[in-house]
Amino acid sequence: MKINTLQSLINQQITQVGHGGQAGRLTETNPLTENSHQISTAEKAFANEVLEHVKNTALSRHDIACLLPRVSNLELKQGKAGEVIVTGLRTEQLSLSDAKLLLEAAMRQDTAADG
């Protein structure tokens, strides 16, 4: 899935739910009607799809500040210049707001590399 398509899906789900705290999904299931407390395969697929785009992305200080309450969900490393780099996920789901923030960071990095 292209990064722009994934960002559109995230924005649609945030609009549908009304906030970004809900775990993202790659299917059309309605998160408001799903009662399961287990992580669904759609949530796992969503997290893996986002990770595919954001792995090895350097985060800004603002990104880190926004992610701080949930930073334990991410695998991070320090780069050679002291930057914080996303290397993986420690959970099998990712909130819509975190996914949106991480994808925006990946887009900034891609734009800077192309520029």
Swiss-Prot record:
Induction: At 37 degrees Celsius in the absence of calcium. This is Yop proteins translocation protein M. It comes from the Bacteria. Residues 27-38 have a biased composition (Polar residues). It comes from Yersinia pseudotuberculosis serotype I (strain IP32953). InterPro entries: ProtTyrPase_YopH_N, ProtTyrPase_YopH_N_sf. Transmembrane segments: none annotated. GO terms for molecular function: protein tyrosine phosphatase activity. Residues 19-38 are annotated as: Disordered. It holds the Pfam family YopH_N. NCBIfam families: T3SS_LcrQ_reg. Belongs to an operon involved in the translocation of Yop proteins across the bacterial membranes or in the specific control of this function. Keywords: Plasmid, Virulence.
